[in-house]
Amino acid sequence: MDDIDSSDGAAAARAGEIGSIGVSTPWKPIQLVFKRYLPQNGSASKVHVAVKKPVVVRLTRDLVETYKICDPQFKYRGELNPKRYLTTPSVGVNNDGFDNVNYDLILAVNDDFCSSDSRQRYIVKDLLGHGTFGQVAKCWVPETNSFVAVKVIKNQLAYYQQALVEVSILTTLNKKYDPEDKNHIVRIYDYFLHQSHLCICFELLDMNLYELIKINQFRGLSLSIVKLFSKQILLGLALLKDAGIIHCDLKPENILLCASVKPTEIKIIDFGSACMEDKTVYSYIQSRYYRSPEVLLGYQYTTAIDMWSFGCIVAELFLGLPLFPGGSEFDILRRMIEILGKQPPDYVLKEAKNTNKFFKCVGSVHNLGNGGTYGGLKSAYMALTGEEFEAREKKKPEIGKEYFNHKNLEEIVKSYPYKINLPEDDVVKETQIRLALIDFLKGLMEFDPAKRWSPFQAAKHPFITGEPFTCPYNPPPETPRVHVTQNIKVDHHPGEGHWFAAGLSPHVSGRTRIPMHNSPHFQMMPYSHANSYGSIGSYGSYNDGTIQDNSYGSYGGTGNMFAYYSPVNHPGLYMQNQGGVSMLGTSPDARRRVMQYPHGNGPNGLGTSPSAGNFAPLPLGTSPSQFTPNTNNQFLAGSPGHHGPTSPVRNSCHGSPLGKMAAFSQINRRMSAGYSGGSQSQDSSLSQAQGHGMDNFYQNEGYSGQFSGSPSRRQLDSGVKNRKQTQGGTTLSTGYSTHNNANSSLRSNMYNPSSTAHHLENPDTALSVPDPGDWDPNYSDDLLLEEDSADESSLANAFSRGMQLGSTDASSYSRRFNSNASTSSSNPTTQRRYAPNQAFSQVETGSPPSNDPHARFGQHIPGSQYIPHVSQNSPSRLGQQPPQRYNHGRPNAGRTMDRNHMNAQLPPSNTNSGGQQRSPRSSSYTNGVPWGRRTNNHVPNVPSTSHGRVDYGSIA
């Protein structure tokens, strides 16, 4: 009992002790008593906390899981997702629904392209930009896990062809001139066709310089950054000059940053407007704020225009605003003269076609006493005021906003605000750098393109090198590089211009993708068809290389011709250009000049006369400067042959073939119906230049052949082959002229139909009129003096028989000389009147037959018979300022000719490699009539050619 009591007391005491402890301290169980629960497999499980996902997440990111909760059988397929289109508008209209109404490929996120050559896949992720040329998409390459920029060209032939030029130029620059990527030119990776669209793959770059200025709130960049970018741009321009390439569209939007490289670098992009320096094509190029004076004035241009644009870019980088923000070309030129204190030199103004649009002649180029003074120099020209321009153009010029308080370059640069809180020493240092910048800009923006600095000269300026600037920079002289061929310049006049220059049309979308047709601009064909230097509108003359149907009015045909001139250069046949290089046969795309004739060679003579009615009326917007008189075009009255100058090297007559007619008696002595040309050849190359190529070529323009030195020349058989066509009971005996080197004799064996039995029975006595391209450069006046009076009298009679222009049903013979002797004249000077009209004989539909007296050479041809010029627009590129080329503008639906309602017929629609129709628009096509051939004529028994000839359609 006592034990129980004692034990109870101990328990009570222990309980009281525990109770007192529990009050003062927390309870801590023994570790051995409580252990973590372990399942049978022996691994501890994590504690899961149930967190409910927001509704937004379950219905967006986890939408597929939500659907599977509702329906375990649900399967997701990405191709069924509604597409997020990147192209606007996104409604399929053309190209079997792949293209919209603008012929842009309809792009959507996650669309993929595939290159058939490289087997590379490109998945579209975003749209970087778009323009009238097409679109630029940001694409992901799964194989390399990288991004690239893919330019998708519009599904139209003009854009396609121009994009091929860009591909060719960039490939050449990357692989040949800059294989190590050190000259800041964008890299091209790949190009391929996708759904009939040409796609070009470039490296992906960052923002352009304009966006950089915009981010900086249009405040100028620091001089150190301006110097860094300028040095890199000069490296790119030096590479272009070394390659003989003109960018033609240099501006801040086309210079992109490459932020992946440190320090930051830039790269020049967008070579869609680029061309070779010796094969310039377009006259309306460059964005307006960065357009050079020679382009504004319509003067022949070189790589110097890129240096002008570069100067404008450097000024804009420093100022934050464009230096010449003109609202129109007149406004830009006015600002240039005002800010720079100079004007273009007189030799440029004298030759430029747009001079009368912006300047007035206040003196004579030979007597500058009455002229104005600009920059301390006398000038025969003075810039028009706004009122004078309005009076001439019948509209007010658009004037842009004035951003600067000062009107000259030095004050604009000096007065630009300095950076806030800039130390005094830095202000003095920057002031000296600004003086160097002013001198640098003056050298880049020199009105005289011959004096404008080259990239190599500009790279040595103290502003670029960092040397102290103490005096105006005098660049080291450079040996000018003179190109062999004469520049070809095509105006954007309403008739053809931009598109027809390269054989293109913005309306032709249904074409098999073939290389660009053979032209001086893109000599890619293995063969060529000749034309004549003597016809108006033909630009493929002696040294240009004869080309396929390269009549300026048709580009691919033989019948469509526009009488249009622009001021590429003096239109003489053999003269000295500014570089001192003879240009045998210059482009007729030159300013028309009213020539001054001696007595007897007026409008009734054979020379060109503005009253002759043989030129089409001026198109709207054409400058009258094309028709200003010229003081150095004078025909010498005397010549041994009494038919005007006997050699094209002695006169300039727009390529008239009649300047050599005085040599007929000597040529006629050596020619007959059976003349083969082999035995009389002065050079063995003549035998190679005859026969084969001419045998399958039946062209007008005098049946001229091609040079043996032409890039696309074919080896020809010896001998001149004649072929006879019988139509309506009349035998037509035709011949073919050949061209050989300058050391060879150029002759013609072209014979003309005649209604007299004398010619049929005795063809040896029939006069063979030499072709305009068959002038013999080795022929001298001494040979003419050897002729007796009997030969001269027979020459006059025979020559008169060859002065008829006739046209038979065969359009290929439409430009022949008929041998009807009824038009002979006793006055030889009257036999030069309509020489240029050879180029117009095909414009007429339904020309009279060859024996029609009204079709003779001396007959007056009304001006209404020629086609007036029609407006022609060009496409535009991304960011391009002027309404032109790739920024440009917008193909028209069609062009209507004023005479006989002549419509341009497009080539037949073809299918691409994918079998899809290339041309979705409804247009009228012709399969049987090549360009230039009249639709009411037919040429039977056309000889087959060894190389397939491309018929481009008809402008009938």
From Swiss-Prot:
GO terms classed as biological process: positive regulation of abscisic acid-activated signaling pathway; protein autophosphorylation; protein phosphorylation
Cellular component terms per the entry's GO annotation: plasmodesma
Class of the enzyme per the UniProt entry, highest EC level: transferase
Reaction(s) catalysed by this chain's protein: L-seryl-[protein] + ATP = O-phospho-L-seryl-[protein] + ADP + H(+); L-threonyl-[protein] + ATP = O-phospho-L-threonyl-[protein] + ADP + H(+); L-tyrosyl-[protein] + ATP = O-phospho-L-tyrosyl-[protein] + ADP + H(+)
Stimuli inducing this protein: Induced by drought stress.
InterPro entries: Kinase-like_dom_sf, Prot_kinase_dom, Protein_kinase_ATP_BS, Ser/Thr_kinase_AS, Ser_Thr_dual-spec_kinase
Post-translational modification note: Autophosphorylated at Ser-222.
Keyword ATP-binding: yes
Entry keyword annotation includes Phosphoprotein: yes
GO molecular function: ATP binding; protein serine kinase activity; protein serine/threonine kinase activity; protein serine/threonine/tyrosine kinase activity; protein tyrosine kinase activity
Domain spans labelled Protein kinase: 122-464
Feature: compositional bias, Polar residues: 622-636, 697-713, 725-757, 806-817, 838-849, 870-884, 902-912, 937-947
EC number: 2.7.12.1
Stretch list, region Disordered: 620-657, 672-781, 806-956
SUPFAM superfamilies with a match to the protein in the record: Protein kinase-like (PK-like)
Keywords: ATP-binding, Kinase, Nucleotide-binding, Phosphoprotein, Serine/threonine-protein kinase, Stress response, Transferase, Tyrosine-protein kinase
Function: Dual specificity protein kinase that phosphorylates ANN1, ANN2 and CP29B at serine and threonine residues, and ANN1, ANN2 and ANN4 at tyrosine residues. May regulate the phosphorylation status of annexin proteins. Acts as a positive regulator in abscisic acid (ABA)-mediated regulation of postgermination growth and drought response. May regulate the expression of ABA-responsive genes such as RD22, RD29A, LTI65/RD29B and RAB18.
Assigned protein family: Belongs to the protein kinase superfamily. Ser/Thr protein kinase family.
Protein name per its UniProtKB record: Dual specificity protein kinase YAK1 homolog
Organism: Arabidopsis thaliana (Mouse-ear cress)
Gene, per the UniProt record: YAK1
